[in-house]
Design a protein with these regions (language model features):
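Class I S-adenosyl-L-methionine
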Residues: 165-172, 176-220
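S-adenosyl-L-methionine
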Residues: 1-53, 63-67, 92-116
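Conserved beta-strand/loop positions that form the S-adenosyl-L-methionine
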Residues: 57, 80
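Charged helix-capping and loop-helix junction motifs
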Residues: 137-145
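Conserved beta-strand signature within the Rossmann-like core of class I S-adenosyl-L-methionine
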Residues: 152-160
């Protein structure tokens, strides 16, 4: 009888080595044409805007995008998710200061960085944690996409309900040369559907924040 493998219990010992490999190696995966088309569909609007840009990556049904747009009324908020099914459930507000886009952020981050986008803030809220140790390279900081995430810059905010993910995210940022702060969330108003669900069932919630425009750690 096969028993399910338990979640990873602590940060990987070789995390810094993996990060160094990603940051020093070119990602050879070609950008998909549908991703390029999705990027071009919003490129002009973003370039024409004088408002600070906030990116809400993997936004799900877009609740977080709408809430961020309400919290930052002077910004242009761009919510991105690859799932047509999830985005179809979004309750749009035609007068809001945000855009919703279906795209794969693996490609979108690279295209945005290559185009010179400079988001003021970037939110990555409750990404799939892939908790098994064998799934490490599927986590954002364990994948080649982490380099593009870093290249975009801006004030990065990541939230998760898994403490190991938060710990590893801090370690990954440190390995890349960036300072970060981590904290447990207690009284914050939920801004995503997942955050509401996790809070209602009593999960511990964690936040990691890093200013990717400030390289503050000496590289060895």
């Amino acid at each position: 009888m096969n028993h399910p493998k338990p979640p990873q219990q602590q940060p990987r010992q070789d995390l810094a080595e993996i990060i160094a490999t990603h940051l020093s190696s070119a990602w050879l995966r070609p950008v998909a044409e549908h991703s390029r088309a999705a990027f071009e569909s919003v490129h002009r609007a973003v370039d024409a805007s004088t408002a600070p840009l906030i990116i809400d990556s993997c936004c799900g049904i877009g609740d977080s995008t709408r809430n961020l747009a309400s919290a930052f009324p002077d910004a242009l908020v761009l919510g991105i998710d690859k799932s047509e099914h999830r985005l179809a459930r979004h309750r749009s507000d035609d007068d809001a200061n945000y855009l919703i886009l279906r795209a794969d952020v693996n490609d979108f981050w690279r295209l945005a960085a290559e185009a010179g986008w400079q988001p003021a803030q970037h939110f990555l809220l409750y990404p799939n944690p892939y908790p098994k140790a064998s799934q490490f390279r599927k986590r954002w900081y364990g994948s080649p996409a982490f380099s593009a995430l870093i290249d975009l810059g801006g004030l990065l905010t990541m939230r998760t309900n898994w403490s190991v993910y938060a710990e590893e995210f801090v370690l990954a940022l440190n390995a890349a040369g960036y300072q970060s702060s981590g904290r447990q969330l207690f009284d914050e108003k939920p801004i995503t559907a997942f955050e509401t669900k996790y809070k209602e069932r009593g999960d511990s919630l964690f936040e990691v924040v890093s200013d990717l425009d400030q390289v503050a750690l000496a590289q060895t």
